């Protein structure tokens, strides 16, 4: 049996070990290899693309299709360009209705450019390919992004090309032929003059999320296979002091590059706790420029200097939580006003507090709340009824969790015949679809309570899924779940007996609010980690599942089954024979 009572230090990422790093000024030099250190795979892919014998002129990069990511990739590509600043392109000389092309001799020529990297997250046809304009008989030619990127690299988001397939077909043709032809965008309105085509050589980086890449692969299977591929790594694994330093330098670089304040020495621990909540891992921190910039932009209004303090960051996070917390508070009010029945004291047979995460479309913050699961057992033919599934409110994953839970119980009891009970399980006061298996351990405990006729401690909530062998498996949304139950207990007054049971594998995901951490430190709230559902049963039901020399839950259930089977056997006689029993002397 493995039951671990977590200390307050287990509830947040370890930052005490890195105080010396936080105290150091993280000065960033323009020549620092920050990008290659944090994005080695993407850096290597760029080197392959820029090689004189590159296998393809196209590169696919998996990354969010936002300007921050495109600019980071563009800056990295610029540092690798060996021919940066080389004059390429040409000059169109327009004389009446006659247009002639010559080689560029200076950067001032209309279609000349110095080899560069151009990035755009959204473009229209004229922006990408340029256009011919005619006004009062005068003709002018406007260069597009492909002309600006001539001899260099064009970085563009995939959603632009997927939404405008004709742009992609023309761009691919230009890259493959290494030549740009002037054509009318509207076939019904041809160009008024003939414009000579021009040599144009460029490499293209297509940036997209997983869905965009999948759509592009379906549209261009051969090119997708031949293109150089890499990914922007959104997280950094913290394995030692060097990786912490690396992350701190990346955050500082991102802030300074965007003219925003960077974290001060006492702000780093708070930022790391918030970062761990974002990634869902204590030892994984985000490299996402969008996430970093959001924190720095919001706290910038609270500070005047080049750095922000821990107090300022903490205040910003509290303000954000309050600003986004209306729905969570209303849901808590429903419980506190007993419109939703959740007990946090006492004992109940077949009732247990599970934990769930609520996400509303359009709302930026997920929040947790307890859910009451109830189980009713009666004499029957061994049927287990999932009311959510029967009412078509349960998803497939939820149904799978229910079947796994039943399989474990039947395997443990080792019955020679069908169990003489029927049971029904449900999420009480749940009127929307339920899916996922994160409540399967709670459901199993409620079922065992009902079968054994032993009450469950209502001051303890539980989350976690379970496999067919009873092992507790990790689930998501853990911080929100624990904080949701803690908020209800806190409003009703903490007794020191309340707490939450989680799978041991979930401990690494914890990054809880300071208020909850303080309550655990003071012994007012407890979090237990278990490896197996049988480890949770003594905490919830005050009886062990199995053992020698003591009353156990398995023994209690087997005795109830034996009693029910005997009663069922008596009632199997035909009614005339049961009537004759009255005349048989004892």
Swiss-Prot record:
SUPFAM superfamilies on file: Ribosomal protein S5 domain 2-like (SSF54211)
Gene Ontology molecular function: ATP binding; ATP-dependent peptidase activity; serine-type endopeptidase activity
EC number, as in UniProt: 3.4.21.-
GO biological process, one term: proteolysis
Keywords of the record: Hydrolase, Protease, Serine protease
Active site: 438, 481
One Pfam family named in its UniProt record: AAA_32
Superkingdom classification of source: Bacteria
InterPro entries reported for this sequence: AAA_32 (IPR041699), Lon_proteolytic (IPR008269), Lon_Prtase (IPR027065), P-loop_NTPase (IPR027417), Ribosomal_Su5_D2-typ_SF (IPR020568), Ribsml_uS5_D2-typ_fold_subgr (IPR014721)
Family per similarity comment: Belongs to the peptidase S16 family.
Protein name according to UniProt: Putative Lon protease homolog
Source organism: Escherichia coli (strain K12)
